[in-house]
Every structure is written in structure tokens, then in C-alpha cells.
Amino acid sequence: MEPAIKYRLIKKEKHTGARLGELITPHGTFPTPMFMPVGTQASVKSLAPEELDAMGAGVILSNTYHLWLRPGEQIVKEAGGLHQFMNWKKGILTDSGGFQVFSLAKNRDITEEGVHFKNHLNGSKMFLSPEKAIQIENDLGPDIMMSLDECPPFFESYDYVSKSVARTSRWAERGLKVHQHPDYQGLFGIVQGAGFKDLREQSAKDLVSLDFPGYSIGGLSVGESKAEMNHVLDFTTPLLPENKPRYLMGVGSADALIDGAIRGVDMFDCVLPTRIARNGTCMTSHGRLVVKNAAYAHDFTPLDDNCDCYTCRNFTRAYIRHLIKADETFGLRLTSYHNLYFLLHLMKQVRQAIMDDNLLEFRQNFFEMYGFNDKNPKNF
């Protein structure tokens, strides 16, 4: 049986671990490295599917935990799955719900069977097992699904992380056994291990032996420094098969996308661009711009003079500032559109730089313009 998700390697960058490729899904083939907008509740906040399509989004992420609680996976299944429910004709990826259980839910209790917790909406008692997570995701109907994992804090003790990694591996095997639709839904295993090299190696070895169609790198962007995250990626991505996609979960700042691509990551997602947009913070080629600040009240230039998105072609900083100060929803739509377009366009530039074998030069120029003032990474 052909796997639902396939990866085609097109080219490796000469000077780094970066790779240009294609993610092949039941709902289309998409170029990688790629950024995936997050639609937590089966909607990318304030934006229509047509707008996401127009700006070049290929795969959208939705959150299993939130959709399980509301409206419930059975309603989504009844609608014909997430693609029909939200009218998105391209790729959809769902997480397992594990991260939300560990970050949002109260009174959680982790056992070998799964996680007991209280619903953060109404306080009711809930239970999520590896099997239940897969059943929910099968019903939601995305192209790509995640195994249930525990995401331990980056600075947790070695002993705790060691036990957590072993349990996550057992949970991955249990989830794989009950996965109903491997022919049109690809299930990824999630590599954990915090900052411990030997535990990351063990986690990757366990999961690669199960032959998932793709692999996620979890437990990063959870409070550690950028240098620590890059260090973990340096020794983690080489552990994963070259013929499978690699997905770095929950990472969405411009510098982290470039540095992740340099280290061989193919897929990224994060709520960051839309979350900061709702606070009036915009990503531009010259760095972050807080457009609601008084300094922009009389500024009749675009958010970013190097951007050709709908927002920058049609509206000024002064107007967008006015909308946000007046609590007009249109302002949030404009900043959200711009930030997502900015990251999707950035990944297009990264792909071109890989093709041209000048990704380190691109990184240096981008970081100087953006204001990161960082040196080229030397160790891959």
C-alpha cells in the first residue's frame, strides 16, 4: 500500500543541511521548506480560505484538542471531514492534542494508559489516550496526523525526560496500531528528548524503527534559547530518514525558520504571525514594527516597502494604526494577512536560496536587515 504522505527530495544546498523538496499529500503537492498557518478552531483567525490560497498557503494546521471539545469530532466527520467543514481544498495537518492537554488543561495526571485532565472550558473530567487521539484525528480527516506525545519542559531533569521519551515511543506504537486510514492519512511520529542528545537519539531510533511516513521534532520553542534550539536541531535532524519529511513543531519566527531550514527541516507551523498581528505587531523586512504606536499616526507609507501583499499594496501604516486603535476588525485582518504573507514569501526566498546554493549569504543579509545582528552559524 502506498503511504498517504510522500516526500521528494529535489536538491541539497551545498554549504548547509538545507534541502529543497516536495511534500506530496492527497490534497496536493507543496514545495518545501514550507510554513503552515495555524487554524486552531478550523479557521485561521480573521482570514478566509480564498485569501490563504491567494497568498500561497499549502497546508493549514488545526488543533485536535480544541476541535474535540468544540464542536466535537463527530460533527466534523458528519460534515465530511475538515476539508469540507472549513472549505479548504489543500492540505490539512492536525496535532494530537497532547501539547494543549499539557499546556491548557488543569489537574492533569499522566499514566501509561494516557492523560486524565480537566476540560479548560467547563472543568469536566476528560481522558486522552494514544488510541483516542488517533480515533479523533481519523474522524477529523486531515491529510497529516500526529501521534500522542508528552512534551516535557526543556529544562526538566534527565530522569524525567528519559521516562517520558520511553512512554512517548510506546504511545506512538499504540497509535500506529489503531490508525484506520494509512492510505489517505499520514501519521507522523514525534521525536522528543528535551536538550539531551542521547535521549533524542533513542527517541529517533524508536520512531524510525516504526517506519512512519514523516517525523516531527517536538519539545522545542518551549522556553529554551535560539542557540539551544539550533544545537538540538544540529544533532536531531541527521537522525531522521532523508526520504521522509521533517516537521519542526511550533516554530514561526523569521530567524528560526531560516535556521531550521539550514539544519534540514522541511515543515514549520506557529500561531506567532497571527497572534502578534492582533496586537498590532507586524513582521517586515526591516524587523518587527508595532504599528499601533503613536510614531505611525502620520505615516502614510506601507507596513513594508519591500512587500507586495494586499495590505501593503493598498493601505498605510497610519490607516492600519487608526483601525487597530479603534478596535476595528479590519485592522486585525490586514495585519494578519501581511504577517502570514511575509512568512510564506520568506520561505519562497529560502527555497530560491537553496536552489542557488547561497542560503548562508541570504541569512546574513536578511538578519542584518531584520536587525538580528547575528553571525553565520558554523556548525551544522
From Swiss-Prot:
Keywords: Glycosyltransferase, Metal-binding, Queuosine biosynthesis, Transferase, tRNA processing, Zinc. InterPro entries: ArchSynthase1/Queuine_TRR (IPR050076), TGT (IPR004803), TGT-like_sf (IPR036511), tRNA_ribo_trans-like (IPR002616). Its EC number is 2.4.2.29. SUPFAM superfamilies: tRNA-guanine transglycosylase (SSF51713). Homodimer. Within each dimer, one monomer is responsible for RNA recognition and catalysis, while the other monomer binds to the replacement base PreQ1. This is Queuine tRNA-ribosyltransferase. Its cofactor is Zn(2+). GO terms for cellular component: cytosol. GO terms for biological process: queuosine biosynthetic process; tRNA wobble guanine modification; tRNA-guanine transglycosylation. Binds 1 zinc ion per subunit. Residues 250-256, 274-278 are annotated as: RNA binding. Belongs to the queuine tRNA-ribosyltransferase family. Transmembrane segments: none annotated. Pathway: tRNA modification; tRNA-queuosine biosynthesis. The active site is at 95 (proton acceptor), 269 (nucleophile). Zn(2+) binds at residues 307, 309, 312, 338. The keyword Cytoplasm does not apply. One of its GO terms (molecular function) is metal ion binding.
